Design a protein with these regions (language model features):
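Structural signature of multi-pass, alpha-helical inner-membrane proteins
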Residues: 20-156
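Hydrophobic alpha-helical segments of integral membrane proteins
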Residues: 10-12
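Bacterial N-terminal signal peptides that target proteins for export
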Residues: 1-7
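N-terminal signal peptide c-region/cleavage motif recognized by signal peptidases
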Residues: 15-17
Length: 156
């Protein structure tokens, strides 16, 4: 009988903790790698917009931990876009990436899929990443659960 109570209590706690977890948004920014780096450091990918076959670094330069706020947009094709505001660490990482990798491609992954590709043609020191389109309503909903909107008042 005690065993049945323990199992029942465990199932109730497991179910409540599983339902309490909301899906957070993941963002990864990967710089273009070198095919000579090998499979440990770079992986081949076909870019969605230009269709180029490139190698990207397996380690992301910027992640969702570097994002401090966002602003969603409705794109003309019916999807969504977003402006991501980076914190100080993300701003420095983006600035460094844009200086060191000028002339290369950067891929932005949102929730595990490629949202956009960016070509680095100048220094980016404002700490903002713009995703013009290609995001779904679920992506925006997960962003809403993860970060505040740019310019929104902080909750007390």
């Amino acid at each position: 009988m005690t065993r049945a109570w323990a199992i029942g209590l465990f199932l109730i706690l497991a179910a409540s903790s599983a339902s309490a977890k909301s899906k957070k948004c993941t963002v990864r920014v990967h710089g273009q790698g070198n095919e000579n780096d090998g499979a440990v450091f770079a992986t081949p990918v076909t870019t969605p917009i230009s269709g180029k076959n490139i190698f990207i670094e397996k380690i992301a330069t910027i992640s969702e931990h570097d994002v401090s706020a966002y602003r969603p947009y409705a794109a003309s094709d019916g999807s969504f876009g977003a402006l991501l505001q980076l914190d100080d660490h993300g701003r420095l990482a983006l600035d460094t990436l844009s200086v060191e990798r000028r002339g290369s491609t950067v891929l932005v992954f949102v929730n595990g899929r490629i949202a956009t590709e960016l070509f680095i043609d100048r220094r980016v020191s404002d700490g903002q990443i713009f995703i013009a389109s290609g995001l779904t309503g679920a992506d925006i909903a997960s962003m809403e659960k993860t970060w505040p909107q740019i310019g929104a008042k902080k909750r007390k």
